Amino acid sequence: SIINLSELNKGLVLVTGPAGSGKSTTLACIIDAINRTKEKHIITLEDPLEFLHRHKKSIVSQREISSDTESYVVALRASLRQSPDVILLGEMRDFETISIAMTAAETGHLVLSTLHTQGAANTIDRIIDVFPPSQQRQIAVQLSSVLQAVVSQQLIPGTDGESLIPAFEMMTATPAIRNMIRENKIPQIDGTIYSSAAPNMFSMDTSLQKLYQAGKISADAALAHASNPEMLKRKL
């Protein structure tokens, strides 16, 4: 269901998690799926460039922020003049970058980016909190209309003692979720994800439970990375 995000034509998709959790790999997989299946103009803005994409069905222009341009804001503004369909933004570091990214998503581009947050509710709070208080209401309304999905991920030590297994949470912006963002009921989002039975909406703890049941991670590892260890312990 995460790869299915490549089917989107517009809006904002965020992949979040701590440093070294594999966010760049997840985004590269989504970009590659678009590149293989659609005729699009894709621009990637990264610091540093981690994955090189060859042209397949799409045209992919890759810019390294440190060597090709002076900042994400400058690079993002320049990229919008080149008629991209898809923009991969390595990181959203400040409110100016976030603001331009949201406007790009609003005007018909698919914008993919990352944040160092864990969980959808924390991510949404973080974006809104970056802005001055006087703008936060307007940003919440804008975010509620442009956000398509938030994927959170972490890498869990595998039972073989060597591998690291990715575990994911996925929030899809349903009408109910959009309403929660708009009405500042963000704390309710985690509960909605937790209780969802939809294939494109699942909690981190559901992922951990499935990985444990498949024998890929230990119970201790699952509980150490859980959002709600007490509840997960009962399920294991």
Predicted regions and their residues:
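Short, flexible helix-loop junctions that flank or precede catalytic/ligand sites
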Residues: S1-L236
